Amino acid sequence: MNSSFSAPAKKSLGQHFLADRYYIDRIVQAVDPRAGQHLVEIGPGQGAITFPLLRRHGALTVIEFDRDLIAPLTEVAAPIGALSIIHRDVLSVDFTALANGTPIRLVGNLPYNISSPILFHALDHAAAVADMHFMLQKEVVDRMAAGPGSKVYGRLSVMLQAYCEVTALFVVPPGAFRPPPKVDSAVVRLVPRDPATVQINDRRRFADVVRAGFGQRRKTLRNALSTICEPAHFDAAQVRPDARAEQLEVADFIRLANVELA
């Protein structure tokens, strides 16, 4: 049963509403909600994923910025289950406070125009997040899951993989959306790593090293990091200064950022 409703997509908000039942079902199966879990959907849109999740789980929190969608979401959800709506910009939502001691499971068809900021915002609250299932542009998912040596391996790959296990699940074609986007989409699963296993001494320092390394990716690390790393940093971290950022494993970046010279 499809309980979603029709509403015009707003280009200014980067809206593309999922409409294909096959892919809706695949996403719900991938999330596989269980009793007692706290599900939070970012950008429910017309409710394509919202209502199947609500029907299966009984309770759901959604974060929606478009005020025109609040009333129809509330109306359609009423006979299905308990829907709690947060009408705010997702980047202003404190996921840690929302979790309130029970790790949340984040789900969403993320707006293409702000997908990366949302990902980094979720990372800031990783300790309060059990897992994430997001649909994004396929090229973004490819970058998220890429490994060293890949042309698309970069800052996003390292920053996300340092804190999460990243798994690309499946591709969703443009025809599954209304209106159809110009590119393929893909669904990705992110599972935050146990904080005790993420040995990053200074998150800001780590982010600076990764940003600088990939900021001039064709340069050697010696040159790209010349303002923030001395030769002794490379020696202590056992990282070759003549290597390029795209050749380093995530663990290499972590070791390099963790070096503290006397």
Swiss-Prot record:
It is an enzyme of class 2 (transferase). Its EC number is 2.1.1.182. GO terms for molecular function: 16S rRNA (adenine(1518)-N(6)/adenine(1519)-N(6))-dimethyltransferase activity; RNA binding. It catalyses: adenosine(1518)/adenosine(1519) in 16S rRNA + 4 S-adenosyl-L-methionine = N(6)-dimethyladenosine(1518)/N(6)-dimethyladenosine(1519) in 16S rRNA + 4 S-adenosyl-L-homocysteine + 4 H(+). SMART domains: rADc (SM00650). Pfam families: RrnaAD. Gene3D superfamilies: Ribosomal RNA adenine dimethylase-like, domain 2, Vaccinia Virus protein VP39. Its main location: cytoplasm. SUPFAM superfamilies: S-adenosyl-L-methionine-dependent methyltransferases. Belongs to the class I-like SAM-binding methyltransferase superfamily. rRNA adenine N(6)-methyltransferase family. RsmA subfamily. PANTHER family: DIMETHYLADENOSINE TRANSFERASE (PTHR11727), DIMETHYLADENOSINE TRANSFERASE-RELATED (PTHR11727:SF7). This is Ribosomal RNA small subunit methyltransferase A. It comes from Xanthomonas euvesicatoria pv. vesicatoria (strain 85-10). The gene is rsmA.
